[in-house]
C-alpha cells in the first residue's frame, strides 16, 4: 500500500489521504462497535484503529490513504465497502478472540 521511494509532493498527498481515511475508519469502527456491543467501548476502538492492527493489512499510512482515496472517488458508501472487504474480517476475528479471552 505504500512505496518508500516517493517524492515530497507524493508523500504529502499520501498523508492528506491518510488523514481523511483515518477519520472515516474511526467513524466506521465506532458504528461497528455500537452495533456489536450495544455500547461505547474505547478499548475496542483503539484496538481496531491502531497502527498495529492496520499493519496486518499493510503499511498503516497506506491503508488509511487507500480508505481516503476510496472515499474521495466514491463517497462514504464506497469507503465503508473497502473497509468491510479489507479490514472487517480481521476485526471480527480479533473481536471473537478478545471475547473468548474475556470469558475465561
Labelled PLM ranges:
Residues 1-104:
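RNase III-family endoribonuclease catalytic core
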Amino acid at each position: 500500500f505504500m512505496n518508500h521511494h516517493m517524492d515530497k509532493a507524493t508523500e504529502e498527498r499520501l498523508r492528506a489521504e491518510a488523514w481523511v481515511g483515518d477519520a472515516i475508519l474511526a467513524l466506521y469502527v465506532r458504528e461497528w462497535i455500537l452495533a456489536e456491543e450495544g455500547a461505547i467501548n474505547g478499548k475496542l476502538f483503539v484496538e481496531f484503529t491502531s497502527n498495529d492492527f492496520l499493519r496486518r493489512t499493510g503499511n498503516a499510512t497506506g491503508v488509511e490513504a487507500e480508505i481516503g482515496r476510496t472515499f474521495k472517488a466514491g463517497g462514504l458508501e464506497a469507503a465503508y465497502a473497502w473497509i468491510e472487504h479489507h479490514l472487517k474480517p480481521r476485526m471480527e476475528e480479533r473481536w471473537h478472540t478478545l471475547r473468548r479471552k474475556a470469558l475465561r
